[in-house]
């Protein structure tokens, strides 16, 4: 079976390993000499660094909570929605493998602990005891699934567009004509533009509701 059909079959499967799928897409991309798209797929496999352009689907919204000594984590109500969004909107930089591991923990929410600076700033804003205050962002597990699902969908549509242009490959090779067509067809090389967005901070590292995470 040709490479593109193999990629399509994998991308259409429910429950496919997204990490394995991206590796297959990376192989096809490299064989077609689509260097920019290869770089994007490599970032998905290895994680995004500071300064990288981040795809919009990796921006997620969480729930701001404070740790009460009496009852545990409780929601923090902030009237200024713009201010609240500045804390609850996060960019996830971690690799697909890490995200899949977090999703597989099977908790309803993942906990992202805020930095000491963010804790002090929030405590001052809501007039809480700075020394006693500990804040976190609760990230819905479904948000992690959405990142993985969007990547799978991108790859499926990309493989279908390759087929539409007659770019299929023979075994694990592509002809010079197919390579040239892929490199000149805007429908194909413009897929790199789907992986763009603004840059922010934070990473999820662990998966239970009370677990500590580094920002």
Question: Which residues make up each language-model segment?
Answer:
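Extended, non-transmembrane interaction/recognition domains
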Residues: 134-137, 141-182
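Short acidic, glycine/tyrosine-flanked loop/strand segments centered on an H-E-D-like triad
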Residues: 90-140, 144
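Surface-exposed polar/charged interaction patches
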Residues: 10-13, 28, 47, 102-105, ...
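Long, low-complexity intrinsically disordered regions enriched in small/polar
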Residues: 168, 172-215
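Heme-based O2/NO sensor domains and their adjacent alpha-helical segments
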Residues: 51-100
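N-terminal, leucine/charged-rich tether regions that mediate assembly and partner docking
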Residues: 3-11
